[in-house]
Amino acid sequence: MEEEVAALVIDNGSGMCKAGFAGDDAPRAVFPSIVGRPRHHGIMIGMGQKDSYVGDEAQSKRGILTLRYPIEHGVVTNWDDMEKIWHHTFYNELRVAPEEHPILLTEAPINPKFNREKMTQIVFETFNAPAFYVSIQAVLSLYASGRTTGIVLDSGDGVTHVVPIYEGFSLPHAISRVDMAGRDLTDYLMKILAERGYTFSTTAEREIVRDIKEKLCYVALDFEQEIQTASQSSSLEKSYELPDGQVITIGNERFRAPEALFQPNVLGLESGGIHVTTFNSIMKCDVDVRKDLYGNIVMSGGTTMYPGISDRMQKEITALAPSSMKVKIIAPPERKYSVWIGGSILASLSTFQQMWISKQEYDESGPSIVHRKCF
């Protein structure tokens, strides 16, 4: 019998949910944060059709379902669906009883206060957890990279944020958040593929475009140069087979979609690119800490997985920074899951054990305790 019950670490992303046990080096379960509902009436008796499907099952039956993501831009917008996802995580993916394990959840920085309270309430009241903690995603990514100082560029499916951290303290006045991330790039790719004559419109077809994006897109080091290369030869063209067997060819769309990270104006957004956002965030910090931030720019999240993104980032930041400044981009290979890995490290530290909000504290103070205990 183990004397210590492992905590559960759940990183609820806008696109994928990563879940597992504290102390593990990778999440046990990674599945899409999707809830699907049938678009048609079930007519076969005894098929055991459900009124909703979660995760991979929703993904595989997507042809007959309407897919909804309960988390948009890192903020939970549909709590009933969110509860379904958590239920699925505990009972189907991890196969644990949530009332027996402390639970660590993650959230985006600058999240609405109500959001954390509601999360706390559901964990304690619906799932009866013995203890709970909520941690900021970017901070966990820094833990995972083994640093206490650095500036984290965390870009997932729903939200991108830049969080400077010095000696373990996040500098809240310099945190920037951009509501542009993987999902917007998928939508943009859908749009530019339509210009080529390939239309994708349903929620299921959007998932196909996401797959094209993940398999074929990359970031150009020099965008103008790349556009020229693409127009002169077909060396950059790649083909992709759709589920029905039709083969499509994509060329400059491969790097035009992720270019939106550096030029959000193509999406009609006013914010600066990720390089400008990172630079501005560093400039909001004290002059004494900037050198350490320039030298520790840590990438995390699935949207930083494009080939070529580190080199481009290095080039762009170097151009903005003072000429003598040493700029270093750290892009760990496991950065897709670095938030989860950081959570796993945090929840297994002996010094962390007094940080949990216990069920008893919750019963005494209610959901608002989360603002006092988790920061």
UniProtKB/Swiss-Prot annotation:
InterPro entries: Actin, Actin/actin-like_CS, Actin_CS, ATPase_NBD. It is an enzyme of class 3 (hydrolase). It comes from Penicillium chrysogenum. Its EC number is 3.6.4.-. The keyword Transferase does not apply. Its main location: cytoplasm. GO terms for cellular component: cytoplasm; cytoskeleton. This is Actin, gamma. It is found in: Cytoplasm, Cytoskeleton. Belongs to the actin family. Actins are highly conserved proteins that are involved in various types of cell motility and are ubiquitously expressed in all eukaryotic cells. Pfam families: Actin (PF00022). One of its GO terms (molecular function) is hydrolase activity. Keywords: ATP-binding, Cytoplasm, Cytoskeleton, Hydrolase, Nucleotide-binding. It catalyses: ATP + H2O = ADP + phosphate + H(+). It comes from the Eukaryota. Gene3D superfamilies: 3.30.420.40, Actin, Chain A, domain 4. PANTHER family: ACTIN.
